[in-house]
Amino acid sequence: MRNLSNADLAHLLDQPIFHHLSAVADDLQLECYVVGGYVRDLFLERPSNDIDVVVVGSGIKVAEALKQRLGKQAHLSVFRNFGTAQVKYRGMEVEFVGARKESYSHDSRKPVVEDGTLEDDQNRRDFTINAMAICLNEARFGELVDPFDGLLDLEDGIIRTPLDPDITFSDDPLRMMRCVRFATQLKFFIEDETFEALQRNRERIKIVSGERIADELNKIMMTDHPSRGFVELHRCGLLELILPEFTLMDIVETRNGRAHKNNFYHTLEVVDNICQHTDNLWLRWAALFHDIGKPRSKRWDVQAGWTFHNHNYIGSKMIPGIFRRLKFPMDSKMKYVQKMVDMHMRPIAIADEEVTDSAVRRLMNDAGDDIDGLMTLCEADITSKNAQRKQRFLDNFRMVREKLDDLKERDYKRLLQPCIDGNEIMEMFHLQPSREVGTLKQTLKDAVLDNKVPNEREPLMALLIEKAKKMGLDVPQK
């Protein structure tokens, strides 16, 4: 984070879009401020093309005036029912709203809105770090307005609400998810009173639509260390309401002195591991769900101890129901996660034994195009604290990958090798090894490589005969 004076802020806002905003606001004699995430990210040195503007008065009027000033390159959208507008210009999105104050009923997160002051608007913001504003009017251009010491919280790495957190979260329960999400994204801590309010108000999450919750979960999942967010959701009690199947994994049971590992924290370790190697959202979710079937499959065996037989299959059958409840897409993405969960034990079984061509080929055939993702998941699943055992698995997985690459290369070459070879050409045209044979072989190979003909006998034979005739060779009669 950097320390910025008002003069520094004015310098950073010395961009055409902000000067245009300043000019139209002054022409309309309206106070105009850039607020929220854009201001926060200026201090954090995080690039942003999304600009939120609050106008004390009509935000729509300022948006319309800005569009007129910018001309055809700007695109204006007006949402009069909500009193908001948006201008898109050269890759930037500027959102406009009039300063307002809000009140809520207990059974809805949709507020009753009325016109207000900048102070009213800052009061309704979710967190102090998002409640800072910078004036854009020429006389005060670059002046920071920070009534809740959001800058101090930004410096200290704290997530805190501007007003009473119980009111903040009860009024709009989605803010509880946003609280955890910001803490995860920014690697901040949730202030104690704010966290306690999360615990007290967790049941209010039930009035939030599944789509909104899913959006916040996905944002947590796309951070560098999603485990931080899921631990916070678990600690405050939200996770039990959103993903009860996952919280059931937070248990260690001991019998006859034999215990199984805590699969909740093992899973979070796997998720963090996989995030170092992929930005694929659904592969990350597959990592979170890979052992989701363990609580249902757990059995005690006097000889073997704790077992989780078929937990991969049981877990894969749970995925559609979880996706449906979370309002996740019920399409190829769901089937991909289901497939990864079902197959995640296969490479481990191969790596634990002798790595044979036939076993790897069966794996490659069953996994298809998803083989690389499956291998990435399985490598992330190695969390053993036994360094020797962990290294043995890593070495074996490396052998599996090498075998996969070798088989892919061999299959690729076989696929591109014309099914009519040189020996058949020589026999067909009564030739000895010669330049003519090489020319005919190359003709077939080029045609296959360039995808001009399929690598099938009949079309290749027709091409071969055509080329032989052009070369003046004796073509055998059928």
Which sequence ranges carry the predicted segments?
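Catalytic cores of the polymerase beta-like nucleotidyltransferase superfamily
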Residues: M1-K478
